[in-house]
């Protein structure tokens, strides 16, 4: 007998795991809108309080992938997603979105999966629109952008239509739930290389192991120890890496790469327009904390994408991509191509 919603809720209250096949069934009921908003809210809150297991998260991600509108990308050699869970409360400018242009200019293919702001001042979709990028493209058009420009942006609501059954519940609850954790695990192009920023150190090990179970090849999950869901200049960064089937955890420090330790206060923004202006400043080569933070994160992404042999080598490629103007040119190409394909 499949698990009932009431049984699943009881498990969470008793701090017991919902097993893989049970979680598949439960998640399909949620995605199909078969549960009432009250029951959905109770279960996802119960999971959060209990703490979701890697098995529960992996099963939920499998169902979200099953229900998603895919983007088919034939050339997957250096295909990478640069994504954050959000929820770090830092209200920084869109570092991973900026790093995407830099990584693409240095040779990665970026399939960026993102949405509007939930907890920050500016989500990736918000800043992309502020930059003039058309974010509502058909899957075939996104695949062409990846092939021709090296970047494709997948606006999450367009690829996860079943999430409409959960969206009102998430909004009303206003707290982090399993769905914050699932975003980086449900890239519609199923990129084999991933850089994920997370909002809590416990998620480093969870995300890297979930991505391993979901078939990823080279993954770096990062948590800035100052609370940032990015590789940070303000503190050490905890890294969980999956490479050649092996998982390792270690810290990296700005000084390891010749970067100055600096507070993230200078990276804070209040609107998508401010985020856009800071992002453009970085791509135009303005020196400072924003430039160095983006170079570090693009360097990690280039290492994850197997374009660079190490984070340090990736950082050097990132700096060169900005200095040459190639990163800014990528942005201009993406604006033009998305409008041509719209």
Curated annotation (Swiss-Prot):
Pathway: Amino-acid biosynthesis; L-tryptophan biosynthesis; L-tryptophan from chorismate: step 2/5. It comes from the Bacteria. SUPFAM superfamilies: Nucleoside phosphorylase/phosphoribosyltransferase catalytic domain, Nucleoside phosphorylase/phosphoribosyltransferase N-terminal domain. One of its GO terms (biological process) is L-tryptophan biosynthetic process. Mg(2+) 1 binds at residues 96, 230. It holds the Pfam family Glycos_trans_3N. It comes from Verminephrobacter eiseniae (strain EF01-2). This is Anthranilate phosphoribosyltransferase.
